[in-house]
Structures are given as structure tokens and as C-alpha cells.
Regions:
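PLP-dependent aminotransferase class I/II
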Residues: 1-174
């Protein structure tokens, strides 16, 4: 790494605790406000202090309701610019979903030896990684909305998100 990049990185790394703190605080304020809605099941956070807060995941009872709620939230303005990926049903999350990763599905190695698939430990592996391999995860993907939490949300932005959720959830009946 040259000196210019290193100096930029050094400055940016100093900002990281503030960025993470802002995301974390925004996420938990929104999450707490939505806690009164019984139809939302929030993801269990194993390490709340270690959670950066970059995503709010809300899970609903079935895929159809999830899609309807997602469309309604987007109609309320909970979206990003065209280049952003936000307020989506997790099945739309591209390469972050196991069955959308070509190198995993096709067992493409990372080197000339086709590792890790050519390793002795994997020689008898018959596992397929297409959709349906992990039905519990697949079900969660279909029933979960992913909302990215930027570090620059204002109090007004947070209230707009909370209001949109409350309006949409009220229209679906609590």
C-alpha cells in the first residue's frame, strides 16, 4: 500500500467507531419502537454490543405477507437510489444468499487444484448447494425484509421509518 492510500485509510479508520455507533443507535431505536407489533419477529442478536447495526431484519409469518409489506413500505418511500440495495425481501439479496453463489453451487475451486472441493476431507461430499438445500434458511429468506441502516440517519429519518412501518402494519391488521 502506498503512502497516500495508507494515510487515507488511517483517517477513515478513526471515523469507524462513530460510524458504527450511529448505525447501532439508529437500528436499536427503530427496533425498540417496532417491538410493540406482534406480527414482526426480530432476528435474535447473539452479541448486541458487537452488532454494528448495519441492518434491521424483520421477519413475518409467511412469504406473501412479507412481499405485501415490503411493497407497501417501498410505496411509503422507504427506498434508496437506484444503485442502492435496501428495503428488500432477502431472496433479492443476490450473492449473499448461498444458492446465488456460482462458485458454491458449481463447486468451483479457488485455485488450480480446485480447492476446497478437491481436499481429501471433501472427496465423498455429495452436498448440493442449489435452492432448497437449506429449507429453514430458505424459509427465513422468503419471510424476512432487510433494511440497511446508514450511519447518517437523522432523528427525522428514523421517525419516518417507524411511521412507515406503523402505517403499513396497521393497514394489515395487528
Amino acid at each position: 500500500m502506498d503512502e497516500i492510500r495508507a494515510s487515507i485509510l488511517r483517517v477513515q479508520l478513526k471515523k469507524l467507531p462513530t460510524v458504527i455507533s450511529h448505525m447501532h443507535d439508529s437500528k436499536y431505536r427503530i427496533r425498540t419502537a417496532l417491538g410493540q407489533h406482534s406480527e414482526i419477529r426480530h432476528r435474535r442478536i447473539v452479541d448486541p454490543d458487537g452488532d454494528t447495526g448495519c441492518f434491521l431484519l424483520t421477519t413475518f409469518k409467511d412469504p406473501d405477507i412479507t412481499k405485501q409489506i415490503n411493497r407497501a413500505l417501498r410505496a411509503e418511500g422507504i427506498v434508496t437510489l437506484a444503485q442502492g440495495v435496501n428495503d428488500i425481501v432477502m431472496t433479492q439479496w443476490g450473492l449473499h444468499i448461498y444458492y446465488n453463489i456460482p462458485s458454491l453451487v458449481h463447486k468451483t475451486g479457488v485455485d488450480k487444484r480446485n480447492s476446497p472441493w478437491s481436499l481429501v476431507e471433501n472427496k465423498d461430499s455429495r452436498t448440493k448447494y442449489g435452492k432448497g438445500t437449506c429449507p429453514v434458511a430458505d424459509g427465513l429468506f422468503e419471510r424476512t425484509i432487510l433494511l440497511a441502516i446508514p450511519s447518517c440517519l437523522t432523528d427525522r429519518d428514523e421517525q419516518d421509518i417507524i411511521h412507515a412501518f406503523e402505517k403499513v402494519l396497521t393497514s394489515f391488521g395487528d
